[in-house]
Amino acid sequence: MDIFGENKTQMNTTTPTENWTSVYSIVRWIQMTMAVLSILGAGSIILYAAFQRLVKKPEVLPLFLLSLTDLLLALSWLCGGLLFTQSCNSYATCYNLHIVEQTLYMASFFYTLHYVWVLYTGLNGKYHRRLNGFPAEAARTRNCRCLGPVLSCLLPLLLTAPVFVAGNVFQCYTNFTQPYRCLLMHTGAVYLTSSASPELTACSIIQEYCMAIFLGTFLITIVGMSIFMGKARSLYKRVVTSQGFFGGSHWTTLRLLERRMVLYPSAFFFCWGPALLLATMMLVKPDVIEGKMGVALYILQAFTSASQGLLNCLVYGWTQKHFRSLSSSTVRDANTQTPLLRSQKPNYAALHSAASLTNFV
């Protein structure tokens, strides 16, 4: 334990610390500003879905869970910025806050992937309903839809549990005595001293593990999103051509799908690209990010990563015409000349929801 403590105190120190106080101060204000905007963006989706009673709709629930995760993540970013004061000496608090942040952003990765998967399975169900009169393997799809949100929450907890336990056992939070202690993720020193020990320690292993699981979940998410959007595009062409006619409105929807194929992964990469570069360089060649390049990526990361809640609410929520019009699409007997039987309502609602999924993609 003492050996690890001695090595930790020599690692990740800045020189001279006071020269970079302005950099950390800039990052703090960027992080807090973008976190507040993300809170407003994610909160707007949550409030709209709750007040319009849309949370239980199968195409809205994934977006609601993603927005809820984005809201919690933005709150943690905001807390990190508020804790960035010279008088704050709770180093363990900052370390554990970073673990919470890592758990939340990995959960947001999985919820993003789950959202895109739900869009694809909805379109797939519509295709088989058109061919056979009923969706293919509806029971299995329904079970996967229930299991997806649970796994999206549990997997990040399981992946970050070793970081929490080992980090507190070996007191890795002594690294947070430096002025960047509570800011963002991957907050290694801007400059390393010549006395920094390259010796492999428990804390350095934990740091590399954190970066590895971040890179792994990032790649899984962006590759999965690209695959599902590509499959959705080809599936939509099959849905339309099965009717024997491919009109102008179908081409418009197909072009919309193609734009979404680019937009969804691009928005995700925009949020986490700088963090991806920082993590990769810190794993492969840490010397590269010392100095001005590290500062630039660090400031850029504060702008993009903390803006995820704002960007997601625009890309997946308010820019979607179908999402904005869902409040008026509920089944009401009073508005029909031929009232629906109570037993027919679930089937009608399911068909109406599936038929509108192409507008929601």
From Swiss-Prot:
MF GO annotations: G protein-coupled receptor activity
GO cellular component, one term: plasma membrane
Keyword Ribonucleoprotein annotated: no
UniProt entry keywords in alphabetical sequence: Membrane, Transmembrane, Transmembrane helix
GN (gene name): tmem116
Main location: membrane
Protein name: Transmembrane protein 116
GO biological process, one term: adenylate cyclase-activating G protein-coupled receptor signaling pathway
Subcellular location: Membrane
Topology within the bilayer: Multi-pass membrane protein
PANTHER family in the record: G PROTEIN-COUPLED RECEPTOR 157-RELATED (PTHR23112), TRANSMEMBRANE PROTEIN 116 (PTHR23112:SF0)
Transmembrane segments: 29-49, 64-84, 103-123, 147-167, 210-230, 261-281, 295-315
